[in-house]
């Protein structure tokens, strides 16, 4: 990536920047980064409800993630927060924690890169920044839930790929079958 990129934690005053990046569709199918945070019934309420709920999370001051800026404009997003912020992980047969009571675990749960900035290494830059950020916030370990595309391609890459996480120093932690595996590293 040749452009200078600045990475900042999402804060209430940068909510409009996230909205500009995500657009009317909330990044992906009206998600607004709520897939891992909500029940299936809440998720089914759709785009506007997800947007409102995520705005409430952001304005509460709870950690949510990092925004990447190029030339002052938002171009990328990485969700990173304490694992307990993502209750859907605890219900997932493939991703549920081996020890749900383990403390100090932070999760990198998704990425969104503006179309004009894809395939330039920004996802890796955001992942490295997320690990550093989680460490500064007290994380003992950082988890990710990437898709393994080494044998079968996938169009569902919002959580990243195994190769991306391997390149960033993560190691496989849990693989229970399915498309995603749990990977970890220490900050």
Language-model-detected regions and their locations in the chain:
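Conserved N-terminal entry element of GNAT/NAT acetyltransferase domains
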Residues: 1-36
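Conserved donor-binding loop and adjoining core beta-sheet/short helix segment
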Residues: 24-43, 69-70, 74-87, 100, ...
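Active-site rim helix/loop that mediates acceptor-substrate recognition in acyltransferases
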Residues: 32-64
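Conserved acyl-donor/pantetheine-binding loop and adjacent beta-alpha core of acyl/acetyltransferases
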Residues: 56, 69, 73-110, 114, ...
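Conserved acetyl-CoA-binding loop-helix of GNAT-fold acetyltransferases
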Residues: 108-113, 119-136
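Conserved GNAT acetyl-CoA-binding A-motif
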Residues: 127, 134-155
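C-terminal "cap" of GNAT-fold acetyltransferases
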Residues: 155-168, 173-187
């Amino acid at each position: 990536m040749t452009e200078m990129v600045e990475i900042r934690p999402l804060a209430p005053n940068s909510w409009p920047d996230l909205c500009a990046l995500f657009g009317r569709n909330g990044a992906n199918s009206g998600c607004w980064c709520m897939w891992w945070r909500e029940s299936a019934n809440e998720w089914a309420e759709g785009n506007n409800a997800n947007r409102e709920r995520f705005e409430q999370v952001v304005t509460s001051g709870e950690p949510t993630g990092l925004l990447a800026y190029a030339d002052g404009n938002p171009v990328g997003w990485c969700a990173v927060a304490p694992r307990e912020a993502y209750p859907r992980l605890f219900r997932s047969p493939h991703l549920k924690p081996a020890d749900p009571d383990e403390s100090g675990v932070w999760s990198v749960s998704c990425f969104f890169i503006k179309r004009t900035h894809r395939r330039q290494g920004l996802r890796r830059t955001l992942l490295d920044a997320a690990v550093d950020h989680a460490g500064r916030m007290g994380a003992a370990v950082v988890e990710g839930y990437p898709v393994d595309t080494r044998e079968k391609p996938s169009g569902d890459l919002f959580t990243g790929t195994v190769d991306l996480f391997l390149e960033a120093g993560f190691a496989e932690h849990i693989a229970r079958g399915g498309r995603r595996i749990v990977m970890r590293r220490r900050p």
